[in-house]
Amino acid sequence: MADYNTLYHQGLYLSPDQQDLLLAALSSNQPPQKQQNDKQRSQAKTDPDSTPGNMSSGSFSMSPGFNKTHPGSGGLGYGDDESPFLDFNPELDFDFPGSENLIGDLPGSLPSEEHEVGEKRKDMSDNENEESGKKRRESDDKAAKKPGRKPLTSEPTSKRKAQNRAAQRAFRERKEKHLKDLETKVDELQKASDDANQENGLLRAQVERLQVELREYRKRLSWLTTGSGISAMSAIPSAHSRNLYGLNNNDFMFDFPKFGDLPGGHIFNGPLTKSNQNKPRDGSSPATSDSQVPGVMTRETLNGSNNRGMPTAKAANGVSNNPSPKVPSVYNIRQSASSHDSSNSCSPSSSSDSHQSQMLSSNGTSPEPSSNSPATKLNDSVQNHHACTYSTIDAVRGKSESVSNTPSQPNNNYEQTPGPGLDLLAQQNGGQFDPVLFGDWREPQDAILSQDFGTFFDDAFPLPDLGSPSHNFNEVANPQPPKKDLIAEIDNKLDEEVVPGEDKSQMLSCTKIWDRLQSMEKFRNGEIDVDNLCSELRTKARCSEGGVVVNQKDVEDIMGRVK
Protein backbone atom coordinates (compact mmCIF):
# COMPACT_ATOMS: atom_id res chain seq x y z
CA MET A 1 0.00 0.00 0.00
CA ALA A 2 2.88 2.28 0.71
CA ASP A 3 4.32 1.61 -2.71
CA TYR A 4 1.02 2.55 -4.34
CA ASN A 5 0.90 5.83 -2.58
CA THR A 6 4.38 6.76 -3.61
CA LEU A 7 3.73 5.76 -7.18
CA TYR A 8 0.50 7.74 -7.21
CA HIS A 9 2.18 10.80 -5.97
CA GLN A 10 4.99 10.48 -8.48
CA GLY A 11 2.56 10.14 -11.41
CA LEU A 12 0.52 13.27 -10.63
CA TYR A 13 2.96 15.83 -12.09
CA LEU A 14 2.92 18.06 -15.18
CA SER A 15 5.05 17.76 -18.23
CA PRO A 16 7.45 20.57 -19.22
CA ASP A 17 5.07 21.89 -21.86
CA GLN A 18 2.27 21.94 -19.40
CA GLN A 19 4.48 23.78 -16.95
CA ASP A 20 5.37 26.42 -19.56
CA LEU A 21 1.73 26.99 -20.38
CA LEU A 22 0.91 27.23 -16.73
CA LEU A 23 3.64 29.82 -16.12
CA ALA A 24 2.53 31.86 -19.15
CA ALA A 25 -1.02 31.90 -17.90
CA LEU A 26 0.06 32.88 -14.43
CA SER A 27 2.32 35.66 -15.70
CA SER A 28 -0.33 37.08 -18.07
CA ASN A 29 -2.98 37.33 -15.40
CA GLN A 30 -1.05 37.86 -12.22
CA PRO A 31 -3.54 39.94 -10.09
CA PRO A 32 -6.39 37.57 -10.68
CA GLN A 33 -3.97 34.78 -9.99
CA LYS A 34 -3.18 36.24 -6.64
CA GLN A 35 -6.86 36.51 -5.86
CA GLN A 36 -7.31 32.95 -7.01
CA ASN A 37 -4.39 31.81 -4.85
CA ASP A 38 -6.01 33.53 -1.92
CA LYS A 39 -9.25 31.76 -2.69
CA GLN A 40 -7.44 28.48 -3.02
CA ARG A 41 -5.73 29.02 0.29
CA SER A 42 -9.02 29.82 1.92
CA GLN A 43 -10.57 26.71 0.37
CA ALA A 44 -7.61 24.62 1.44
CA LYS A 45 -8.00 25.78 4.94
CA THR A 46 -11.73 25.21 4.98
CA ASP A 47 -11.56 21.80 3.14
CA PRO A 48 -8.49 19.82 4.27
CA ASP A 49 -9.79 16.52 2.69
CA SER A 50 -9.67 17.90 -0.83
CA THR A 51 -7.82 16.17 -3.63
CA PRO A 52 -4.26 16.99 -4.63
CA GLY A 53 -5.62 18.84 -7.63
CA ASN A 54 -6.88 21.44 -5.30
CA MET A 55 -3.39 22.38 -4.15
CA SER A 56 -2.06 25.77 -4.96
CA SER A 57 0.70 26.37 -7.43
CA GLY A 58 2.82 27.84 -4.74
CA SER A 59 3.15 24.41 -3.13
CA PHE A 60 3.90 22.73 -6.44
CA SER A 61 6.62 20.10 -6.15
CA MET A 62 8.27 18.03 -8.74
CA SER A 63 7.69 14.30 -8.60
CA PRO A 64 10.68 12.08 -8.12
CA GLY A 65 10.16 10.37 -11.45
CA PHE A 66 10.17 13.70 -13.32
CA ASN A 67 13.42 14.79 -11.79
CA LYS A 68 16.22 13.75 -14.19
CA THR A 69 18.79 13.70 -11.46
CA HIS A 70 17.24 10.64 -9.98
CA PRO A 71 18.08 7.45 -11.66
CA GLY A 72 15.39 5.78 -13.75
CA SER A 73 13.61 9.03 -14.36
CA GLY A 74 14.77 9.81 -17.87
CA GLY A 75 11.22 9.79 -19.29
CA LEU A 76 7.81 10.09 -18.06
CA GLY A 77 7.98 6.64 -16.83
CA TYR A 78 4.53 5.83 -18.09
CA GLY A 79 5.34 2.37 -19.15
CA ASP A 80 3.10 -0.48 -19.17
CA ASP A 81 4.73 -1.65 -16.06
CA GLU A 82 4.96 1.64 -14.42
CA SER A 83 1.42 3.02 -15.17
CA PRO A 84 -0.08 4.76 -12.24
CA PHE A 85 -3.61 4.14 -13.43
CA LEU A 86 -3.74 0.46 -12.65
CA ASP A 87 -6.22 0.88 -9.88
CA PHE A 88 -7.51 4.33 -11.20
CA ASN A 89 -11.15 5.14 -10.98
CA PRO A 90 -12.29 6.37 -14.41
CA GLU A 91 -15.16 8.33 -12.94
CA LEU A 92 -12.74 10.69 -11.15
CA ASP A 93 -13.32 14.27 -12.27
CA PHE A 94 -10.25 16.38 -12.55
CA ASP A 95 -12.15 19.62 -13.13
CA PHE A 96 -12.22 21.36 -9.81
CA PRO A 97 -13.65 24.79 -9.37
CA GLY A 98 -11.43 27.47 -10.83
CA SER A 99 -9.44 25.10 -12.96
CA GLU A 100 -10.15 27.07 -16.13
CA ASN A 101 -8.05 29.93 -14.77
CA LEU A 102 -5.00 27.71 -14.29
CA ILE A 103 -4.39 27.42 -18.04
CA GLY A 104 -3.77 30.49 -20.19
CA ASP A 105 -6.41 31.50 -22.66
CA LEU A 106 -5.98 31.88 -26.38
CA PRO A 107 -4.16 34.96 -27.69
CA GLY A 108 -7.21 36.24 -29.64
CA SER A 109 -9.31 36.39 -26.58
CA LEU A 110 -6.76 38.13 -24.38
CA PRO A 111 -7.56 41.80 -25.23
CA SER A 112 -11.24 41.42 -24.70
CA GLU A 113 -10.73 39.67 -21.46
CA GLU A 114 -8.20 42.26 -20.38
CA HIS A 115 -10.77 45.01 -21.20
CA GLU A 116 -13.31 43.11 -19.23
CA VAL A 117 -10.87 42.82 -16.39
CA GLY A 118 -10.31 46.63 -16.56
CA GLU A 119 -14.01 47.24 -16.41
CA LYS A 120 -14.22 44.86 -13.54
CA ARG A 121 -11.45 46.76 -11.81
CA LYS A 122 -13.25 50.05 -12.42
CA ASP A 123 -16.46 48.63 -11.16
CA MET A 124 -14.73 47.29 -8.15
CA SER A 125 -13.12 50.69 -7.42
CA ASP A 126 -16.49 52.38 -7.86
CA ASN A 127 -18.09 49.90 -5.58
CA GLU A 128 -15.35 50.44 -3.05
CA ASN A 129 -15.88 54.25 -3.23
CA GLU A 130 -19.61 53.87 -2.83
CA GLU A 131 -19.16 51.49 0.03
CA SER A 132 -16.61 53.86 1.66
CA GLY A 133 -19.05 56.85 1.25
CA LYS A 134 -21.83 54.82 2.77
CA LYS A 135 -19.60 53.81 5.60
CA ARG A 136 -18.58 57.42 6.20
CA ARG A 137 -22.20 58.51 6.27
CA GLU A 138 -23.04 55.68 8.59
CA SER A 139 -20.10 56.67 10.81
CA ASP A 140 -21.22 60.34 10.76
CA ASP A 141 -24.74 59.35 11.58
CA LYS A 142 -23.52 57.19 14.36
CA ALA A 143 -21.37 60.07 15.68
CA ALA A 144 -24.30 62.56 15.50
CA LYS A 145 -26.78 60.20 16.99
CA LYS A 146 -25.64 59.75 20.50
CA PRO A 147 -27.34 57.21 22.64
CA GLY A 148 -29.88 58.48 25.10
CA ARG A 149 -33.04 60.58 25.05
CA LYS A 150 -32.84 63.68 22.83
CA PRO A 151 -33.87 67.06 24.40
CA LEU A 152 -36.98 68.86 23.13
CA THR A 153 -35.60 71.94 21.25
CA SER A 154 -38.80 72.96 19.46
CA GLU A 155 -40.20 75.06 22.32
CA PRO A 156 -37.10 77.24 22.97
CA THR A 157 -36.61 77.97 19.26
CA SER A 158 -40.23 79.07 18.82
CA LYS A 159 -40.00 81.21 21.95
CA ARG A 160 -36.81 82.82 20.68
CA LYS A 161 -38.39 83.53 17.32
CA ALA A 162 -41.39 85.13 19.02
CA GLN A 163 -39.08 87.33 21.09
CA ASN A 164 -37.17 88.36 17.99
CA ARG A 165 -40.39 89.24 16.19
CA ALA A 166 -41.60 91.28 19.17
CA ALA A 167 -38.27 93.13 19.39
CA GLN A 168 -38.34 93.90 15.68
CA ARG A 169 -41.94 95.07 15.92
CA ALA A 170 -41.09 97.35 18.86
CA PHE A 171 -38.09 98.72 16.98
CA ARG A 172 -40.23 99.48 13.93
CA GLU A 173 -42.82 101.21 16.10
CA ARG A 174 -40.18 103.33 17.79
CA LYS A 175 -38.67 104.22 14.43
CA GLU A 176 -42.04 105.20 12.98
CA LYS A 177 -42.88 107.27 16.04
CA HIS A 178 -39.52 109.01 15.86
CA LEU A 179 -40.05 109.74 12.18
CA LYS A 180 -43.51 111.17 12.88
CA ASP A 181 -42.09 113.39 15.63
CA LEU A 182 -39.40 114.61 13.29
CA GLU A 183 -41.98 115.34 10.59
CA THR A 184 -44.14 117.33 13.01
CA LYS A 185 -41.11 119.28 14.19
CA VAL A 186 -40.12 120.00 10.61
CA ASP A 187 -43.66 121.20 9.85
CA GLU A 188 -43.68 123.45 12.92
CA LEU A 189 -40.29 124.90 12.06
CA GLN A 190 -41.37 125.43 8.47
CA LYS A 191 -44.51 127.22 9.61
CA ALA A 192 -42.53 129.38 12.04
CA SER A 193 -40.05 130.17 9.28
CA ASP A 194 -42.87 131.14 6.90
CA ASP A 195 -44.43 133.39 9.55
CA ALA A 196 -41.08 134.98 10.29
CA ASN A 197 -40.43 135.51 6.58
CA GLN A 198 -43.86 137.08 6.14
CA GLU A 199 -43.36 139.36 9.13
CA ASN A 200 -39.90 140.29 7.89
CA GLY A 201 -41.38 141.08 4.50
CA LEU A 202 -44.01 143.34 6.05
CA LEU A 203 -41.43 145.06 8.22
CA ARG A 204 -39.11 145.45 5.26
CA ALA A 205 -41.89 147.01 3.20
CA GLN A 206 -42.75 149.35 6.07
CA VAL A 207 -39.10 150.36 6.45
CA GLU A 208 -38.87 151.02 2.72
CA ARG A 209 -42.01 153.14 2.86
CA LEU A 210 -40.65 155.11 5.79
CA GLN A 211 -37.37 155.60 3.97
CA VAL A 212 -39.23 156.88 0.92
CA GLU A 213 -41.18 159.33 3.09
CA LEU A 214 -37.97 160.43 4.80
CA ARG A 215 -36.30 161.08 1.46
CA GLU A 216 -39.37 163.01 0.32
CA TYR A 217 -39.28 165.21 3.41
CA ARG A 218 -35.55 165.75 2.99
CA LYS A 219 -36.11 166.80 -0.61
CA ARG A 220 -38.76 169.28 0.49
CA LEU A 221 -36.48 170.61 3.18
CA SER A 222 -33.61 170.95 0.71
CA TRP A 223 -35.94 172.80 -1.67
CA LEU A 224 -36.92 175.16 1.10
CA THR A 225 -33.34 175.81 2.18
CA THR A 226 -31.71 176.07 -1.26
CA GLY A 227 -34.47 178.18 -2.83
CA SER A 228 -34.40 182.00 -2.89
CA GLY A 229 -36.27 184.08 -0.37
CA ILE A 230 -38.88 185.14 -2.90
CA SER A 231 -39.83 181.65 -4.12
CA ALA A 232 -39.32 179.72 -0.87
CA MET A 233 -43.01 179.05 -0.40
CA SER A 234 -43.38 177.87 -3.98
CA ALA A 235 -41.58 174.61 -2.99
CA ILE A 236 -44.64 173.56 -1.03
CA PRO A 237 -46.97 171.57 -3.31
CA SER A 238 -50.15 173.26 -2.16
CA ALA A 239 -48.74 176.75 -2.34
CA HIS A 240 -50.10 177.38 -5.85
CA SER A 241 -53.61 176.64 -4.65
CA ARG A 242 -53.31 179.37 -2.05
CA ASN A 243 -52.96 182.33 -4.42
CA LEU A 244 -54.82 185.34 -3.17
CA TYR A 245 -57.33 187.16 -5.29
CA GLY A 246 -55.85 190.19 -6.98
CA LEU A 247 -52.22 188.95 -6.87
CA ASN A 248 -52.09 187.33 -10.28
CA ASN A 249 -49.92 190.13 -11.63
CA ASN A 250 -47.31 189.73 -8.86
CA ASP A 251 -44.93 186.78 -8.43
CA PHE A 252 -44.28 187.37 -4.75
CA MET A 253 -46.05 185.02 -2.32
CA PHE A 254 -46.11 184.98 1.44
CA ASP A 255 -47.79 183.13 4.23
CA PHE A 256 -50.90 184.95 5.35
CA PRO A 257 -50.22 186.68 8.68
CA LYS A 258 -52.06 185.90 11.83
CA PHE A 259 -55.18 187.74 12.74
CA GLY A 260 -53.55 189.62 15.58
CA ASP A 261 -50.76 190.86 13.30
CA LEU A 262 -52.96 192.42 10.62
CA PRO A 263 -51.40 195.55 9.12
CA GLY A 264 -53.08 198.89 9.28
CA GLY A 265 -54.14 199.73 12.80
CA HIS A 266 -56.44 202.39 11.45
CA ILE A 267 -58.93 199.67 10.64
CA PHE A 268 -59.72 199.28 14.28
CA ASN A 269 -59.60 203.08 14.81
CA GLY A 270 -58.57 202.65 18.42
CA PRO A 271 -55.23 204.50 18.30
CA LEU A 272 -56.66 207.38 16.33
CA THR A 273 -59.44 208.14 18.75
CA LYS A 274 -57.06 207.80 21.65
CA SER A 275 -54.55 210.12 20.00
CA ASN A 276 -57.32 212.59 19.26
CA GLN A 277 -58.10 212.81 22.96
CA ASN A 278 -54.58 212.85 24.39
CA LYS A 279 -52.39 214.79 21.91
CA PRO A 280 -52.43 218.56 21.30
CA ARG A 281 -52.46 219.96 17.79
CA ASP A 282 -48.86 221.11 17.91
CA GLY A 283 -47.47 217.78 19.15
CA SER A 284 -44.39 215.98 17.97
CA SER A 285 -44.16 213.58 15.05
CA PRO A 286 -46.39 210.50 15.05
CA ALA A 287 -43.37 208.20 15.52
CA THR A 288 -42.75 209.32 19.12
CA SER A 289 -44.92 206.62 20.75
CA ASP A 290 -46.45 203.31 19.79
CA SER A 291 -49.97 204.58 20.44
CA GLN A 292 -49.59 207.22 17.74
CA VAL A 293 -48.10 204.96 15.11
CA PRO A 294 -50.63 203.45 12.73
CA GLY A 295 -50.44 199.67 12.52
CA VAL A 296 -49.61 199.05 16.21
CA MET A 297 -52.43 197.35 18.07
CA THR A 298 -52.78 196.64 21.76
CA ARG A 299 -55.43 195.15 23.96
CA GLU A 300 -56.26 198.61 25.27
CA THR A 301 -56.72 200.06 21.80
CA LEU A 302 -59.05 197.25 20.78
CA ASN A 303 -61.26 197.83 23.79
CA GLY A 304 -60.82 201.59 23.82
CA SER A 305 -64.41 202.23 22.91
CA ASN A 306 -65.58 200.38 26.00
CA ASN A 307 -63.54 202.66 28.23
CA ARG A 308 -64.68 205.80 26.50
CA GLY A 309 -68.21 204.81 25.65
CA MET A 310 -70.14 205.29 22.43
CA PRO A 311 -69.51 208.47 20.49
CA THR A 312 -72.22 211.06 20.86
CA ALA A 313 -74.58 212.05 18.16
CA LYS A 314 -72.91 215.40 17.91
CA ALA A 315 -69.60 213.76 17.19
CA ALA A 316 -71.28 211.67 14.56
CA ASN A 317 -72.69 214.81 12.95
CA GLY A 318 -69.26 216.34 12.66
CA VAL A 319 -69.26 218.63 15.80
CA SER A 320 -66.41 217.79 18.18
CA ASN A 321 -66.94 218.26 21.93
CA ASN A 322 -63.23 218.06 22.69
CA PRO A 323 -61.63 221.48 22.34
CA SER A 324 -58.12 220.02 22.32
CA PRO A 325 -56.38 220.11 18.95
CA LYS A 326 -55.95 216.91 16.96
CA VAL A 327 -53.12 215.50 14.95
CA PRO A 328 -54.02 214.98 11.30
CA SER A 329 -54.49 211.25 11.02
CA VAL A 330 -53.45 209.08 8.18
CA TYR A 331 -57.07 208.20 7.71
CA ASN A 332 -58.02 211.80 7.00
CA ILE A 333 -55.10 212.22 4.65
CA ARG A 334 -56.16 209.20 2.72
CA GLN A 335 -59.75 210.42 2.64
CA SER A 336 -58.65 213.71 1.25
CA ALA A 337 -56.57 212.00 -1.34
CA SER A 338 -59.48 209.84 -2.31
CA SER A 339 -61.84 212.81 -2.49
CA HIS A 340 -59.51 214.67 -4.80
CA ASP A 341 -59.07 211.63 -7.03
CA SER A 342 -62.77 210.81 -7.29
CA SER A 343 -62.90 212.18 -10.80
CA ASN A 344 -60.09 209.98 -12.03
CA SER A 345 -60.63 206.72 -13.93
CA CYS A 346 -59.12 204.50 -11.23
CA SER A 347 -61.67 201.78 -10.41
CA PRO A 348 -61.97 200.22 -6.93
CA SER A 349 -60.76 196.89 -8.26
CA SER A 350 -57.62 198.35 -9.80
CA SER A 351 -56.98 200.49 -6.79
CA SER A 352 -57.33 197.53 -4.46
CA ASP A 353 -55.03 195.51 -6.71
CA SER A 354 -52.37 198.19 -6.65
CA HIS A 355 -52.87 198.58 -2.93
CA GLN A 356 -52.27 194.87 -2.32
CA SER A 357 -49.22 194.77 -4.56
CA GLN A 358 -47.79 197.75 -2.73
CA MET A 359 -48.43 196.17 0.63
CA LEU A 360 -46.55 193.01 -0.37
CA SER A 361 -43.37 194.88 -1.20
CA SER A 362 -41.20 194.65 1.88
CA ASN A 363 -37.65 195.25 2.96
CA GLY A 364 -35.10 193.05 1.18
CA THR A 365 -37.56 191.47 -1.27
CA SER A 366 -38.63 194.38 -3.45
CA PRO A 367 -36.39 196.09 -6.00
CA GLU A 368 -37.86 199.48 -5.27
CA PRO A 369 -36.17 201.69 -2.64
CA SER A 370 -37.48 202.16 0.81
CA SER A 371 -38.67 205.62 -0.06
CA ASN A 372 -41.37 204.01 -2.20
CA SER A 373 -42.84 202.12 0.73
CA PRO A 374 -46.48 202.67 1.65
CA ALA A 375 -45.46 204.81 4.61
CA THR A 376 -43.69 207.36 2.43
CA LYS A 377 -46.37 207.24 -0.22
CA LEU A 378 -48.85 208.39 2.36
CA ASN A 379 -46.99 211.68 2.60
CA ASP A 380 -46.73 211.91 -1.18
CA SER A 381 -50.47 211.52 -1.53
CA VAL A 382 -51.01 214.84 0.28
CA GLN A 383 -49.07 216.73 -2.38
CA ASN A 384 -49.96 214.67 -5.44
CA HIS A 385 -53.74 214.59 -5.44
CA HIS A 386 -53.99 212.96 -8.85
CA ALA A 387 -52.08 209.75 -7.91
CA CYS A 388 -54.15 206.58 -7.52
CA THR A 389 -52.37 205.21 -4.44
CA TYR A 390 -54.55 203.45 -1.93
CA SER A 391 -52.38 201.83 0.72
CA THR A 392 -55.18 200.39 2.81
CA ILE A 393 -58.66 199.07 2.41
CA ASP A 394 -60.00 202.18 4.17
CA ALA A 395 -59.11 204.23 1.13
CA VAL A 396 -61.56 202.31 -1.00
CA ARG A 397 -64.14 202.50 1.73
CA GLY A 398 -63.60 206.24 2.08
CA LYS A 399 -63.95 206.71 -1.62
CA SER A 400 -67.23 204.88 -1.72
CA GLU A 401 -68.46 206.90 1.22
CA SER A 402 -67.39 210.18 -0.36
CA VAL A 403 -69.18 209.30 -3.55
CA SER A 404 -72.36 208.40 -1.70
CA ASN A 405 -72.43 211.70 0.22
CA THR A 406 -74.83 214.45 -0.93
CA PRO A 407 -73.47 217.89 -1.91
CA SER A 408 -75.18 219.49 1.08
CA GLN A 409 -73.05 217.42 3.49
CA PRO A 410 -69.70 219.03 4.32
CA ASN A 411 -66.49 217.04 3.68
CA ASN A 412 -65.05 217.81 7.10
CA ASN A 413 -67.38 215.28 8.69
CA TYR A 414 -64.83 212.60 7.96
CA GLU A 415 -62.06 214.69 9.46
CA GLN A 416 -63.67 214.98 12.87
CA THR A 417 -64.30 211.41 14.01
CA PRO A 418 -63.43 208.20 12.17
CA GLY A 419 -65.70 205.17 12.04
CA PRO A 420 -65.92 202.90 15.05
CA GLY A 421 -64.21 199.96 13.16
CA LEU A 422 -64.10 196.74 15.17
CA ASP A 423 -64.96 198.53 18.39
CA LEU A 424 -68.61 198.14 17.43
CA LEU A 425 -68.15 194.33 17.40
CA ALA A 426 -66.52 194.46 20.82
CA GLN A 427 -69.44 196.49 22.16
CA GLN A 428 -72.01 194.15 20.69
CA ASN A 429 -70.34 191.12 22.30
CA GLY A 430 -70.15 192.76 25.68
CA GLY A 431 -66.47 193.54 25.43
CA GLN A 432 -65.51 189.87 25.04
CA PHE A 433 -64.19 190.12 21.48
CA ASP A 434 -60.52 189.14 21.39
CA PRO A 435 -58.85 188.98 17.95
CA VAL A 436 -55.90 187.09 19.44
CA LEU A 437 -58.13 184.03 19.71
CA PHE A 438 -58.26 183.85 15.94
CA GLY A 439 -54.47 183.84 15.63
CA ASP A 440 -54.21 180.16 16.51
CA TRP A 441 -55.71 179.06 13.23
CA ARG A 442 -53.20 178.00 10.60
CA GLU A 443 -53.28 176.80 7.05
CA PRO A 444 -53.69 173.04 6.42
CA GLN A 445 -50.13 173.08 5.11
CA ASP A 446 -48.91 172.95 8.72
CA ALA A 447 -50.27 169.41 9.00
CA ILE A 448 -47.80 168.26 6.37
CA LEU A 449 -44.74 169.90 7.82
CA SER A 450 -43.59 169.52 11.39
CA GLN A 451 -44.39 171.99 14.14
CA ASP A 452 -40.92 173.49 14.04
CA PHE A 453 -41.32 174.77 10.49
CA GLY A 454 -43.56 177.60 11.66
CA THR A 455 -40.63 179.22 13.39
CA PHE A 456 -38.28 178.08 10.67
CA PHE A 457 -39.69 180.55 8.13
CA ASP A 458 -39.69 183.34 10.68
CA ASP A 459 -35.99 182.73 11.34
CA ALA A 460 -34.97 182.03 7.75
CA PHE A 461 -36.84 185.01 6.29
CA PRO A 462 -37.09 187.67 9.01
CA LEU A 463 -39.53 189.94 7.23
CA PRO A 464 -41.15 192.60 9.41
CA ASP A 465 -44.90 192.57 9.64
CA LEU A 466 -46.71 194.95 7.38
CA GLY A 467 -47.75 198.04 9.26
CA SER A 468 -45.27 197.49 12.11
CA PRO A 469 -43.09 200.40 13.31
CA SER A 470 -39.92 198.69 12.13
CA HIS A 471 -41.38 198.34 8.67
CA ASN A 472 -42.75 201.83 8.35
CA PHE A 473 -40.16 203.98 10.08
CA ASN A 474 -37.09 202.13 11.27
CA GLU A 475 -36.20 200.12 8.17
CA VAL A 476 -33.45 202.55 7.15
CA ALA A 477 -32.13 203.60 10.54
CA ASN A 478 -31.88 200.24 12.33
CA PRO A 479 -29.44 197.74 10.77
CA GLN A 480 -30.57 194.18 10.31
CA PRO A 481 -29.23 191.70 12.90
CA PRO A 482 -26.93 188.95 11.57
CA LYS A 483 -28.85 185.97 10.33
CA LYS A 484 -28.34 182.50 11.69
CA ASP A 485 -26.74 179.88 9.50
CA LEU A 486 -29.85 177.72 9.42
CA ILE A 487 -28.66 175.65 6.45
CA ALA A 488 -25.64 174.43 8.38
CA GLU A 489 -27.81 173.63 11.39
CA ILE A 490 -30.22 171.64 9.21
CA ASP A 491 -27.34 169.73 7.64
CA ASN A 492 -26.04 168.88 11.09
CA LYS A 493 -29.45 167.62 12.10
CA LEU A 494 -29.72 165.51 8.95
CA ASP A 495 -26.34 163.92 9.63
CA GLU A 496 -27.47 162.71 13.05
CA GLU A 497 -29.64 159.69 12.22
CA VAL A 498 -31.06 159.37 15.71
CA VAL A 499 -34.28 160.31 17.36
CA PRO A 500 -34.07 164.12 17.63
CA GLY A 501 -34.37 165.59 21.06
CA GLU A 502 -34.62 162.26 22.82
CA ASP A 503 -32.48 160.98 25.65
CA LYS A 504 -31.17 157.54 24.75
CA SER A 505 -30.94 156.55 28.39
CA GLN A 506 -34.68 157.11 28.78
CA MET A 507 -35.51 154.82 25.86
CA LEU A 508 -36.20 151.12 26.36
CA SER A 509 -35.71 148.54 23.65
CA CYS A 510 -38.04 145.62 22.97
CA THR A 511 -35.82 143.16 24.82
CA LYS A 512 -35.79 145.26 27.97
CA ILE A 513 -39.56 145.67 27.85
CA TRP A 514 -39.95 141.91 27.37
CA ASP A 515 -37.67 141.19 30.34
CA ARG A 516 -39.64 143.56 32.51
CA LEU A 517 -42.87 141.97 31.33
CA GLN A 518 -41.64 138.47 32.16
CA SER A 519 -40.68 139.57 35.64
CA MET A 520 -44.31 140.44 36.39
CA GLU A 521 -46.25 137.80 38.27
CA LYS A 522 -49.53 138.49 36.46
CA PHE A 523 -47.85 137.84 33.13
CA ARG A 524 -46.58 134.46 34.29
CA ASN A 525 -50.06 133.59 35.56
CA GLY A 526 -51.64 134.62 32.26
CA GLU A 527 -53.76 137.42 33.75
CA ILE A 528 -52.51 140.13 31.37
CA ASP A 529 -54.05 140.83 27.97
CA VAL A 530 -50.89 140.69 25.89
CA ASP A 531 -52.56 141.84 22.65
CA ASN A 532 -53.91 145.01 24.22
CA LEU A 533 -50.57 145.67 25.89
CA CYS A 534 -48.72 145.23 22.61
CA SER A 535 -51.11 147.57 20.80
CA GLU A 536 -50.57 150.27 23.45
CA LEU A 537 -46.80 149.86 23.28
CA ARG A 538 -46.91 149.95 19.48
CA THR A 539 -48.64 153.34 19.56
CA LYS A 540 -45.87 154.72 21.77
CA ALA A 541 -43.00 153.11 19.84
CA ARG A 542 -40.47 155.16 17.92
CA CYS A 543 -37.72 154.39 15.46
CA SER A 544 -34.05 154.85 16.21
CA GLU A 545 -30.72 153.72 14.82
CA GLY A 546 -30.76 150.72 17.18
CA GLY A 547 -34.30 149.61 16.36
CA VAL A 548 -37.72 150.23 17.86
CA VAL A 549 -37.64 151.99 21.24
CA VAL A 550 -40.28 153.21 23.68
CA ASN A 551 -39.95 155.99 26.21
CA GLN A 552 -39.49 154.77 29.76
CA LYS A 553 -42.28 156.98 31.07
CA ASP A 554 -44.75 155.56 28.58
CA VAL A 555 -43.71 152.02 29.49
CA GLU A 556 -44.12 152.74 33.19
CA ASP A 557 -47.56 154.27 32.61
CA ILE A 558 -48.74 151.27 30.57
CA MET A 559 -47.28 148.78 33.05
CA GLY A 560 -48.84 150.67 35.92
CA ARG A 561 -52.28 150.42 34.36
CA VAL A 562 -51.79 146.70 33.84
CA LYS A 563 -50.71 146.11 37.45
Curated annotation (Swiss-Prot):
CDD domains: bZIP_YAP
Motif Nuclear export signal: chain residues: 528-535
Region (c-CRD): 510-543
Disulfide topology: C510-C534, C510-C543, C534-C543
UniProt biased composition (Basic and acidic residues): 36-48, 112-144, 170-179
Upregulating conditions: Expression is enhanced upon oxidative stress stimuli.
Residues annotated as transmembrane: none
A biological-process GO annotation: cellular response to stress
Biased composition (Low complexity): 52-67, 336-362
Region ranges (Basic motif): 159-180
Composition skew (Polar residues), residue ranges: 300-309, 363-380, 401-416
Record text about domains: Contains two cysteine rich domains (CRD), referred to as the N- and C-terminal CRD's, n-CRD and c-CRD, respectively. A nuclear export signal is embedded in the c-CRD, with which the nuclear export proteins interact only in the absence of disulfide bonds (or otherwise oxidized cysteines) within the c-CRD or between the c-CRD and the n-CRD.
Protein name: AP-1-like transcription factor yap1
Protein encoded by which gene: yap1
